[in-house]
Design a protein with these regions (language model features):
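Polytopic alpha-helical membrane-helix bundles and their juxtamembrane interface segments
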Residues: 1, 11-29, 35-162
Length: 162
């Protein structure tokens, strides 16, 4: 996900004048793949205490949703599908699965995941409301910085989870 954030920020935004909209697709796809892997990890981690059928359902749904969102984003060249995939993947699946795990296990490492989710929401809000500092550090840049902080906390959570 860190590579996707940097790739999206550098190629997709900084060199937009040279690559056009198609320069954004590698960052979009890497980001969606990273979110899908986060989902798979959360589902697998949750299988310790979830019924098998629920884990299986979300595993199959994970394949369907990544394929659907990737095709929609490529066909329409609309970033909204990348955003929707991230909201679904990181909040509905990862956050909710890990919140349930936290309620059952009280694993302190999961607190960093909740902090990461907060930074992810901040990134989304910066982008949605176009909150930038100036024309040279606009909402795209601010949201990528918030995403980078979020990624740091996701990695920290992964290293501290039991």
């Amino acid at each position: 996900m860190g590579v996707a954030t940097i790739l999206g920020g550098v190629i997709g935004h900084a060199f937009l004048y040279a690559t056009g909209i198609y320069g954004k697709i590698p960052g979009w796809y890497l980001s969606m793949a990273a979110v899908a892997f986060f989902e798979r990890a959360a589902i697998r981690h949750g299988r310790k205490i979830l019924p098998y059928s629920i884990g299986r359902f979300f595993s199959v749904l994970n394949y369907i949703e990544i394929l659907t969102f990737m095709l929609l984003s490529l066909y329409t060249l609309n970033f909204m599908f990348v955003i929707l995939h991230s909201i679904y993947g990181l909040f509905v699946v990862v956050f909710c699965f890990m919140f349930y795990m936290y309620l059952k296990t009280k694993d302190p490492g999961l607190v960093n995941l909740f902090i990461a989710t907060g930074w992810g929401i901040a990134a989304m809000l910066c982008h949605a409301f176009q909150l930038g500092i100036n024309e040279w550090f606009n909402y795209n840049d601010v949201s990528h910085v918030a995403m980078a902080v979020s990624i740091y906390y996701y990695y920290k959570a992964a290293s501290e989870m039991k």
